[in-house]
Amino acid sequence: MLTFEMIIVFLGLIGMVTALVLDKMRPGMILFSVTVLFLCFGILTPKEMLEGFSNKGMITVALLFLISVGVRQSGALGQLIKKLLPQEKTTVMKAQARMLPAISFVSAFLNNTPVVVIFAPIIKRWAESVRIPATKFLIPLSYATILGGMCTLIGTSTNLVVDGMILDAGYKGFGMFELGRVGIFIALAGIVYLLFFSSRLLPEVRKDTVGDEHGEADASSFHRVEAVIGARFPGINKRVGDFNFVRHYGAEVKEIKRSGVSIVDNLSRVKFREGDTLVLWADDSFISTWGDSSVFVLLANGKDTEPKAGRKKRWFALTLLVLMIVGATVGELPFMEELLPGIDLDMFFFAAVTTVIMAWTKLFPARKYTKYISWDILITIACAFAISRAMVNSGVADIIAHGIIDMSDDYSPHVLLAVLFIITNLFTELITNNAAAALAFPLALSLSNQLGVSPMPFFVVICIAASASFSTPIGYQTNLIVQGIGNYKFTDFVRIGLPLNILTFIISVILIPLIWPF
């Protein structure tokens, strides 16, 4: 029988999912609203509501944002992709064979978003120069970063979120490369799939419908600029007519590209959305100010906005990154606890040290560090911990887990593992990966407890399924970015992404129980 608290939690979860699907607000505010609802009804205590804001996993994500910026500002990423891109005439498969493995490797250790933000404009300009459709490379770029992120603890924020929940539940967390035991097989299979099928399944280039016909392209200080709306753009969900773009940014919106459609007429009534490509009429100051920010990703502007730094700075940034990874890996070894008692040499420790060194050596502008952190993602993560706790406190997690078991003809853990993968993956395609993990984690705990088996296979499945956002552009931020840059339609993601989702599912449900037995 449902209690009053269960009804409130169910209504809160239904409202949360609905608001996320309809994009009513930013995800962080939606999840925060739900946690406040649970607080008001006594389902969460103030301490339980705020625990996520001090969780190591959440703070580590914030530190990795800054570390990614430090590596990006050094110019190392731009130099890497330029060396990988063939300058002579080539084929799509040959170019992808050079790019995708390296991109996956990089994204295993850096936040996926800055990797895509740096690589996508460079790849687009290169594709135009060698006369190959850029649309053949941009979705594979996003997918390669997602696949790489599955291979390490720090590869994606979802892995750190689940790891934080595991530690809070009293279990041993993931090692740095533990997820790679299954992630590397998925990444290799995914890259092979992209090499053989992406050229056939992805569209040819879609030409722009608006360009120099405005008669303004001859001005010396103004340029036709294409800018993809990022997560920190303040006008998301506001109408163009209500948001004074000229006053905010000194540029005029001429066109909006969305899901393969160019919007020119009645622009004032159109609402801005994350991932939209804006065709702007802007001057040099706009390019210099917003060329390196999380507000926009600048594309066709006639100027190179890639960060530039000396060779020594590039090598120093990469050395710090390698030392952080090695330190966190060695810190997991048993003898380190005896060598340095009282010091927890985990990923958080080394990320914090690396961030401080990067700040004081000016690898990123320390005075402006707040603009490089995606606060909405952090609030989403922090509130995800509270929502997961509310599902456990109210008994909702047990009710849902019991229902899943009852609906399954076979009570085998293998079958229920597959069911959990499908549920988590559907949520991540419709809402966000971190919110999906928040909903799935208490289910994993309840399922394992009711079956009397190890929860670790279920935890790993959540990490993989919540990251495997291939079939829609809305489940993962990098998909939204390349959708705007490549002018893709929603169906483009379904056509190439759905088989990759199925491939990931098959590999996961076969290998995970073998590597992490029940």
Where are the regions that the model predicts?
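Interfacial segments of multi-pass membrane proteins
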Residues: 37-42, 165-171, 357-358, 447, ...
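Juxtamembrane and boundary regions of transmembrane helices in multi-pass small-molecule transporters
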Residues: 1-2, 129-141, 148-221, 274, ...
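Loop-to-transmembrane alpha-helix initiation sites
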Residues: 7-8, 49-59, 176-188, 456-457
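Generic detector of multi-pass transmembrane helix bundles and their immediately adjacent loops
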Residues: 401-402, 406-487, 491, 495-504, ...
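Transmembrane alpha-helix interface/packing and boundary motifs in multi-pass membrane proteins
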Residues: 16-25, 102-111, 143-154, 326-333, ...
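Hydrophobic transmembrane alpha-helices of multi-pass small-molecule transporters
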Residues: 1-62, 66, 196, 200, ...
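Alpha-helical transmembrane segments of multi-pass membrane proteins
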Residues: 10, 93-105, 131-148, 179, ...
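Membrane-embedded alpha-helical segments and adjacent helix-loop junctions characteristic
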Residues: 33-36, 40-130, 190-195, 199, ...
